[in-house]
């Protein structure tokens, strides 16, 4: 169902089933001041002009308001099963900006900020002057990894224009035309599942069984510990090493993603207890649906939308690294099918039902190294913006999610010719030293298996 103006300036639509499913997962941790799977995306940048913190903050706030006009869904709220957007008055716009754009002191680091983030009814932004970095934080039902980085790009572009005094006149009241529809609306999926959709959904649901008895990392610390903050261990390959990795992957007819995925499997087996290393490894096959959507929904104008999907996929411990990599390559190349797309609504409906029925949690809880990739991040965030003599250079980008479980997530992307490996973990279950060691092993495994080390 499309957006409808229910009162002057108030636009509403039903929450999509995929949004509802992801929101249900995130909301369960609100009682402890956290939000599982909330997304953080950021960029470190420099400007060719020196600005006082006060002036930069003023430019950022102006850019933030203009950014909302271009991507109004960042200011949507949800109550019950309804998503709402209110065209703001000047006072409401100022109040929203003050609530959602946070300027931190020089001593605040991105690592500490992310570990302390709390749920918000809106997408929020954080300026870290000490790192020359901006971070966007959003509930996962609002966007996905690709969309989050596209939003980073859009904000930096708007900021560069604001600094370069290239502002545009904003006609509040017509931004509703850019509100994001749900994936079910974009794919024109029926409310009532057909027999074909039910069968496709059944096949996707079957993959959940692969999580049972799967290998995971050996536990450390207190098994009964409550989750704490989300931290990360990061490793960046040099441009020369990245080029060598890409060439070696091409020679073996596998993608970088498939190679890193096979390395995540190898890392999980290495980090498992010795008596668990013969178990199969199960992880998520994640796909961006954006390339499969009709324009304009396939483009960055609809970055503030949840357009992703996936299913579980196992590989046995008996296979070699290259056998696993080739199996992942085949799966990534064939995973998005007509059946997969047409069951997106019903699959989410079934998962919501499973969660609401309160199925007992798996014992032991999953603890594998899972994987998520945004590929070439330069396709999402430009390394350089120029407006009226103002030059904004992006030094680096980053993407991750909040995790409140024993699972870790390897995020990978390339930017400015470098492969970035970003291991996200909860500090209640992993010591920083172990996480740093794990990401080093991951990179070493990748290079060794490709004949580069």
From Swiss-Prot:
Taxonomy of the source species: Eukaryota, Fungi, Dikarya, Ascomycota, Pezizomycotina
Gene3D superfamilies: Chloramphenicol acetyltransferase-like domain, Nonribosomal peptide synthetase, condensation domain
A GO molecular-function annotation: transferase activity
Stated family: Belongs to the trichothecene O-acetyltransferase family.
InterPro entries, per the entry: CAT-like_dom_sf
Function, in words: Highly reducing polyketide synthase; part of the gene cluster that mediates the biosynthesis of azaterrilone A and other azaphilones, a class of fungal metabolites characterized by a highly oxygenated pyrano-quinone bicyclic core and exhibiting a broad range of bioactivities. The first step of the pathway begins with the non-reducing polyketide synthase tazA that assembles one acetyl-CoA starter unit, five malonyl-CoA units, and catalyzes a series of Claisen condensations, methylation, PT-mediated cyclization, and finally releases the first hexaketide precursor through the R-domain.
Protein name: Probable acetyltransferase tazD
EC number: 2.3.2.-
UniProt induction comment: Expression is positively regulated by the azaterrilone A cluster-specific transcription factor tazR.
Chain's gene name: tazD
Keywords annotated in UniProt: Transferase
């Amino acid at each position: 169902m499309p957006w409808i103006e229910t009162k002057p300036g108030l636009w509403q639509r039903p929450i999509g089933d995929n949004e509802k499913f992801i929101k249900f997962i995130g909301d369960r941790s609100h009682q402890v001041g956290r939000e599982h799977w909330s997304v953080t995306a950021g960029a470190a940048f420099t400007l060719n002009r020196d600005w006082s913190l006060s002036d930069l903050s003023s430019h950022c706030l102006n850019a933030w308001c203009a950014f909302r006009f271009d991507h109004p869904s960042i200011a949507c709220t949800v109550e019950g099963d309804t998503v709402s957007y209110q065209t703001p008055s000047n006072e409401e716009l100022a109040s929203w900006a003050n609530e959602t754009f946070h300027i931190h002191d020089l001593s605040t680091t991105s690592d500490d900020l992310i570990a302390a983030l709390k749920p918000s009814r809106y997408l929020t932004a954080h300026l870290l002057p000490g790192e020359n970095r901006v971070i966007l934080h959003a509930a996962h039902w609002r966007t996905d990894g690709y969309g989050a980085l596209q939003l980073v790009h859009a904000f930096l572009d708007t900021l560069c224009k604001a600094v370069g005094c290239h502002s545009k006149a904003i006609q509040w009241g017509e931004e509703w035309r850019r509100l994001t529809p749900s994936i079910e609306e974009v794919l024109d999926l029926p409310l009532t599942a057909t027999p074909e959709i039910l069968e496709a959904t059944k096949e996707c649901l079957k993959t959940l069984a692969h999580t049972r008895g799967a290998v995971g990392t050996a536990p450390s610390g207190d098994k009964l510990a409550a989750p704490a903050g989300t931290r990360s261990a990061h490793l960046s390959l040099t441009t020369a090493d990245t080029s060598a990795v890409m060439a070696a992957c091409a020679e073996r007819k596998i993608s970088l993603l498939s190679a890193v995925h096979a390395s995540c499997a190898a890392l999980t087996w290495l980090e498992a207890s010795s008596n668990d290393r013969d178990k199969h490894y199960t992880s998520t096959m994640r796909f961006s649906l954006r390339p499969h959507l009709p324009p304009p929904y396939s483009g960055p104008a609809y970055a503030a939308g949840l357009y992703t999907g996936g299913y579980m996929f196992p590989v046995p411990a008996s296979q070699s690294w290259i056998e696993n990599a080739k199996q992942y390559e085949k799966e990534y190349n064939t995973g998005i099918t007509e059946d997969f797309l047409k069951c997106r609504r019903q699959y989410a409906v079934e998962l919501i039902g499973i969660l609401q029925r309160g199925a007992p949690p798996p014992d032991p809880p999953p603890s594998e190294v899972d994987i998520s990739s945004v590929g070439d991040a330069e396709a999402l965030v430009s390394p350089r913006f120029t407006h009226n003599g103002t030059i904004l250079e992006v030094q680096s980008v980053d993407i991750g999610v909040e995790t409140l479980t024993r699972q870790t997530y390897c995020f990978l992307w390339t930017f400015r010719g470098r492969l970035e490996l970003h291991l996200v973990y909860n500090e209640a279950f992993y010591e920083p030293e172990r996480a740093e060691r794990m990401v080093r092993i991951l990179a070493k495994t990748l290079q060794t298996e490709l004949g580069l080390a």
